[in-house]
Amino acid sequence: MNTILLQNLVNPNVNLQVVLPEMIVALTGIVVMLYDCFVPRQRKVTGAISLIGLAISAFFLLSTWNDPAYTAWNGMIAHDGLRLSFSLVFLFTSAVTILISTVWTDRENVPVGEYHAMLLFATFGSLFMASGNDLVIIFLGLETLSISTYVMAGLRRNDLRSNESAMKYFILGSFASAFLLYGMALVYGATATTNISEIALKVADPNFPALLLVGGSMMIVGFGFKVATVPFHVWTPDVYEGAPTPITAFMAVGSKSAAFASFLRVFVLGFPLIAGVQASEFLHESWITALSVMAILTMTVGNIAAILQDNVKRMLAYSSIAHAGYALVGFIGAGMARSDQERDSAIAAVAFYMLTYAVTNLGAFAIVTLIAQKNDRRTAFEDYNGIGFRSPVLAFTLSLFMLSLFGLPLTAGFMGKVLVFRPALNAGNTLLTIMVIAAVINSAISAYYYLRLIVVMFFRERTTDWLAPRIPTALAAALLITVIGVLYFGIFSDGVIESFSKSSAVNAIRAER
């Protein structure tokens, strides 16, 4: 018996090291839940435990940064550049969300232990969505993330808006998951496998079954919901507005990044060149056209709707839809890449874009959380009137985040957009060139609502009494980290994108470990 157990432990297909970051995050979540059972409502302790667990997970992830790419667990787990870069985004997002949440958990009557545990379990699911090289693993990771997020969205049990947000997210999220799962089932029926690497080989065959196209289309619907692309975006504004602000920040960044990681792995690596130009040029052009139109609509609808908003959270919700469209430009560029190196660079660009979006958006939501007060009472534009003179630190910091979201040069948002647009522009395709032009025009349109908030803060008089809130230490740390990130990634982005590209190229995957 001991010999069999030892053989399993040293079996290259059962590599515990490759899933160590995920295991650490899951175990930390369990520890937080157990601690909260015996010593409830210890916000600082459960928060500290969560941050330590995330830091240890990041340490083990970084220790494997220069390892060659490989798969493990019978090909179900992939260790490559896509996994590494996106996993760092998830861990960073969760850590900053915990720091932002301190001011919220202090003033709201929420079960803080459950909140930290759910956030860790959501991160655990996100990590598997990036590392999963099998449709089953990706779906399990997605559901772990989704269920945890449903719970967090409804943590304010006595708030009708929070309850409505959680219910809408649960119903529509379940509907999208059903589409995704049915699509995966059809792909399995067409290819007799759920392994993404094996699916890629099947797609390259010109005689692949038509059922594969139906399955792929249904999976696009499922991923489109999770990413919040048009026309699958309708849930986003109501859910983002009703959910507690720190949870909204996590959903806007963490959930979206995780969905993009899986989207890239399935449709760029599993369906090479987006359903395989080797199989059918007509089919290839059809996929490109459909996704390009989706990207243009997502950017345009998101920006136009954001202009019409009078609530900052709803404005940021529609802004996140537009940013999903920008990231989709890089996704399509990766699918159109003419070589493995170009494809890896495009994937790294999308990961970098999600990192810059995370840094900027989390910083903005940190200030919104601080100003909103209990039950998010102050989230309208008029609540920001004149705060530039009463709290210049908050106003100037929020202005920096708005300018980065717009894409002002020397900010992280600018470099993120430049790098994510480049692969599509280099593809030499007329439709993709039009898509990039549309993205640039939409970026210019977005200046209206981002600058509107800045104008409100500095050029509108306040008609009500307002005292500048005290900035807690943890939230000050979150703001400092995000401000440094916005400036650093805007000026010194070359090193980061090069590291993402070289971490371990996805095309280098060869053998099991």
Predicted regions and their residues:
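Alpha-helical transmembrane segments of multi-pass membrane proteins predominantly involved
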Residues: 1-513
